[in-house]
Design a protein with these regions (language model features):
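ATP-dependent adenylation/nucleotidyltransferase module used to activate substrates
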Residues: 1-179, 189, 205, 397, ...
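AMP-forming adenylation/ATP pyrophosphatase catalytic core
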Residues: 40-41, 124-130, 136-423
Length: 423
């Protein structure tokens, strides 16, 4: 008799990961729960939220009768995620730490711990996402050796794992998984990929998981929590006072504590002014922030992004883009925003230009961009480094990637047409 497949499931202390572990248990797998402590923080009442979450994760394991492990990646999180976050903010960009955390912590540190230390056949998380592999195909990856050398054969390229949008398009989290490597995707299960959030809550309620069901869902940047962001960031970065300047007439309207505290499209807090002003440009040399008087001011819109580097989920660009040098797409740069039609252009130096058919508002430095192909094949890449071209022709950088209508895919052809529109 074959031994049960061993799946190590990341438990956050929340309802999603708890139900993910429950569903794996129901499928007959040998499940182990692991709680990751990535940040030392206190809430407003002086209680360590990580300790509380760990207790909730442990209770989940008790209810499900599965082994529980706790690991600390506080040092790794600081070095690979938070330090990068601070560095990007200091440069005036708007990074997404959730994407970096998934890349370096959950799907690298935790992934290797589960496989190497716990002997996992596969790992699992409570993310709302899917891949192109069925469960049994995921387990088979354990016995497939990674190709050696610089080149892979055509079979391996054609069978790159695709990251697909979840059934619940509102809760879909593939945007945050866009930098997960092929190696990790091949060994990962997403039990919630075909479920809605409401159904997940129903499952929790019917299976004695009330303690996680009653918890409020975490939103925003995890290590900031409910704290004032300006006060938080100024604990780590030195204030760099500068001026608020009108984009229309260069008139000085006020002062600020640091240009890194503002992102494009954000309402600027300028004392003494009744009408709202919005950030449209930042001068990193002088530390000045340019603002406009309307939320729909033309200076807020961009229609061209230039990449400095691209990270492909499939580890290489699609053959069609290489062949034709151009490709029609849709893209997004914020989670849950509507997709915008665009055209990808592959340059000789390997950079990619993204030209939006219609200019988009508040495309900020360091954000993640996504796109979906409008043709009969689907592709996607993960975040790249982009520059924005605006009326002021200022050099910018954007971490972006390409997102398919059904989710993040590995820029490799898929035989059937795109169906539906992603949200």
């Amino acid at each position: 008799m074959q031994a049960a497949r061993h799946v190590v499931c990341a438990l956050s202390g929340g309802v999603d990961s708890a139900v993910a572990a429950l569903l794996l248990r129901r499928r007959g797998y040998q499940v182990t729960g692991v709680f990751m402590k990535n940040w030392d923080t206190l809430d407003e009442h002086g209680v360590c939220t990580a300790d509380r979450d760990c207790e909730d994760a442990y209770r989940v394991c008790q209810i499900l009768d599965i082994p529980f492990h706790q690991v600390s990646y506080v040092k790794e999180y600081w070095n690979d995620v938070f330090s990068d976050f601070l560095s990007e903010y200091e440069k005036g960009r708007t990074p997404n730490p959730d994407i970096v955390c998934n890349k370096h912590i959950k799907f690298s540190c935790f992934f290797h711990y589960a496989v190497d230390n716990l002997g996992a056949d596969a790992v699992a998380t409570g993310h709302y996402a899917r891949t192109s592999l069925e469960d049994e195909e995921v387990f088979q990856q354990k016995h497939i050796r990674k190709p050696e050398g610089l080149f892979r054969n055509r079979f391996e390229v054609r069978n790159a794992v695709k990251l697909l949008q979840a059934a619940d398009s509102f809760k879909d989290q593939t945007f945050f998984l866009s930098q997960v490597s092929q190696d990790a995707l091949r060994r990962t299960l997403f039990p919630l990929g075909g479920l809605t959030k409401d159904f997940v809550k129903k499952i929790a309620a019917e299976n004695r998981l009330h303690h996680v069901l009653q918890k409020k869902e975490s939103m925003g940047i995890c290590f900031v929590g409910k704290r004032n962001f300006e006060n938080f960031i100024l604990q780590y970065l030195q204030p760099r006072p500068g001026k608020f300047i009108s984009i229309e007439d260069n008139k000085v309207l006020g002062t600020h504590k640091g240009w890194f505290l503002y992102t494009l499209g954000q309402r600027a807090k300028i004392g003494g002014l009744r009408e709202p002003w919005y950030v449209v440009e930042k001068d990193g040399t002088k530390g000045d922030v340019f603002v406009a008087p309307r939320t729909d001011h033309p200076a807020l819109y961009r229609d061209l992004l230039r990449t400095n580097r691209v990270h492909w989920i499939a580890e290489e660009p699609p053959a069609a883009l290489v062949r034709d040098k151009m490709m029609e797409c849709h893209f997004r740069f914020r989670h849950q925003m509507a997709l915008v039609p665009c055209v990808l252009t592959l340059n000789q130096d390997g950079t990619v230009w993204v030209t939006a058919v219609k200019a988009v508002r508040a495309l900020a430095l360091g954000q993640v961009s996504g796109a979906s192909l409008a043709s009969c094949t689907r592709w996607a890449s993960a975040p790249a480094r982009l520059s924005l071209v605006s009326a002021r022709v200022a050099e910018r950088a954007l971490a972006g990637g390409f997102h398919a209508r059904e989710g993040w895919l590995p820029f490799s052809p898929l035989e059937h047409p795109v169906c539906g529109v992603g949200g």
